[in-house]
């Protein structure tokens, strides 16, 4: 039931407790002000007397280590104080990572690569945010890698991305997503093309581990890696692959003892596997809600948000000018492959896509690769377009794009399974 709190109310939080709230109603707005004491939102400190605004979809917890008084006004669907939080365990994990970082600093070695794993909706992205915030607050500059192609915390879903974290996440907007390294995958689950997923993860790990060496501070700070919530069968194999690719020093397992035991058995003994509880505040999302939040991220990519609106452009591209490809050809038995090639290689093959009405609403990734002879899988991407119309008579498509100009002459576009219905009037 929704709680109308338009007059506002003060909440007094004891040490080690948190105020949790959710906003589900459209156009609802909640204002939060820290009046006294110290408080943080997923690791970012609140500034006293500053008003923070949250809108629909917000599911947050304001935690305090010392105790505080917060003023909250607006319409919320859920709002309560909880004294049961795993924050002390989380800060202990941060302290352990700091030990690794100090060690790395002294020996001029790479800092820890840490994988955050667990089933869906256990707070993996939130734990990444907390650990990254704590790291920057003590002067570190870690990398944040997001391998969760189902949601896309850095880029949009269907891609694997890494950013350098230089300052704490904004309370309202999360981490600044400037200059990310993004590799195209094109599916919303690794099962869409397992071979390609592992290849993209390997490439991302190789490039980012190397990039650590370019800056002394980042080198000792290490990488925090967010992973997919698919932890059974092939999903588990993908986690093991990621742990190897990133040369993980530690794996933090949220909530699932079975996964923890499997990892203890399967990773080398020098990798620290730690089981952590999930927070009771983490909100479970239905399939529909996951779909919605994926769409919301894509919408934000094109249209921004209420605080920073963007105004995308639409332009026509003739079929003949559309250099559209897809990664992964249909499987063939090994016996039908050219000599020296395996059926697996087909899964990483770049194949041309013919324009048909089936392209409608699909997201197309604009690659920095100039031709299919380049390493398309391992080339950063420039951005995304969305097909808003396919006109078979005019032999053209309309593309929605953040860029005003038509596509660069040699633009290479990659087909993605992701779709976005542009009904932003
Ligand atoms: P996925 O399986 O999609 O990758 P996840 O395991 O990464 O999910 P999160 O995205 O971290 O889970 O958390 C799910 C939702 O719960 C988010 O909207 C987050 O803001 C919210 N959440 C996390 N921790 C808390 C908390 N302590 N109190 C209230 N809400 C929370």
Swiss-Prot record:
InterPro entries: Clp1 (IPR028606), Clp1/Grc3 (IPR045116), Clp1_C (IPR010655), Clp1_C_sf (IPR038238), Clp1_N (IPR032324), Clp1_N_sf (IPR038239), CLP1_P (IPR032319), P-loop_NTPase (IPR027417). ATP binds at residues 18, 59, 121-126. GO terms for molecular function: ATP binding; polynucleotide 5'-hydroxyl-kinase activity. Gene3D superfamilies: Clp1, DNA binding domain (2.60.120.1030), P-loop containing nucleotide triphosphate hydrolases (3.40.50.300), Pre-mRNA cleavage complex subunit Clp1, C-terminal domain (2.40.30.330). It comes from the Eukaryota. One of its GO terms (biological process) is mRNA 3'-end processing. Its main location: nucleus. The keyword Lyase does not apply. One of its GO terms (cellular component) is mRNA cleavage factor complex. Pfam families: Clp1 (PF06807), CLP1_N (PF16573), CLP1_P (PF16575). It is found in: Nucleus. Keywords: ATP-binding, mRNA processing, Nucleotide-binding, Nucleus. Required for endonucleolytic cleavage during polyadenylation-dependent pre-mRNA 3'-end formation. Belongs to the Clp1 family. Clp1 subfamily. This is Protein CLP1 homolog.
């Amino acid at each position: 039931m929704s709680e109308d709190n338009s007059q506002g109310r003060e909440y007094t939080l004891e040490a080690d407790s948190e105020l949790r709230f959710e906003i589900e109603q459209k156009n609802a707005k909640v204002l939060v002000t820290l009046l006294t004491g110290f408080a943080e939102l997923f690791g970012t400190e609140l500034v006293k007397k500053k008003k923070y605004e949250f809108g629909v979809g917000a599911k947050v917890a304001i935690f305090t280590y010392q105790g505080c008084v917060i003023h909250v006004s607006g319409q919320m669907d859920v709002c309560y104080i909880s004294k049961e939080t795993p924050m002390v365990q989380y800060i202990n994990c941060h302290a352990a990572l700091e030990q690794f970082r100090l060690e790395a600093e002294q020996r001029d070695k790479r800092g820890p690569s840490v994988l955050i794993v667990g089933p869906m909706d256990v707070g993996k992205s939130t734990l990444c945010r907390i650990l990254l915030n704590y790291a920057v607050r003590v002067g570190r500059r870690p990398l944040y890698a997001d391998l969760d192609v189902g949601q896309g915390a850095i880029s949009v879903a269907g891609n694997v991305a890494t950013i350098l974290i230089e300052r704490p996440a904004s309370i309202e907007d999360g981490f600044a997503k400037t200059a990310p390294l993004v590799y195209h995958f094109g599916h919303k689950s690794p099962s869409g093309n397992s071979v390609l997923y592992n290849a993209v993860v390997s490439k991302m790990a190789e490039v980012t581990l190397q990039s650590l060496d370019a800056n002394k501070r980042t080198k000792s700070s290490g990488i925090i890696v967010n992973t997919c919530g698919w932890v059974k069968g092939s999903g588990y194999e993908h986690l093991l692959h990621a742990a190897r690719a990133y040369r993980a020093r530690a794996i933090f397992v949220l909530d699932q003892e079975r996964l923890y035991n499997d990892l203890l058995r399967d990773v080398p003994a020098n990798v620290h596997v730690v089981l952590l509880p999930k927070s009771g505040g983490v909100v479970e999302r239905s399939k529909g809600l996951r779909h919605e939040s994926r769409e919301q991220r894509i919408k934000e990519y094109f249209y921004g948000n209420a605080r920073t609106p963007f105004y995308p452009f639409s332009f026509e591209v003739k079929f003949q000018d559309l250099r559209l490809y897809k990664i992964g050809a249909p499987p063939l038995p090994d016996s039908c492959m050219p000599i020296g090639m395996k059926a697996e290689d087909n899964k990483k093959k770049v194949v041309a896509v013919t324009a048909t009405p089936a392209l409608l609403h699909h997201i197309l990734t604009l690659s920095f690769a100039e031709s299919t002879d380049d390493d398309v899988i391992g080339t950063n991407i420039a951005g995304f377009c969305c097909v808003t119309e396919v006109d078979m008579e005019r032999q053209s498509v309309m593309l929605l794009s953040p860029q005003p100009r038509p596509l660069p002459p040699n633009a290479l576009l990659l087909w993605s399974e992701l779709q976005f219905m542009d009904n932003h009037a």
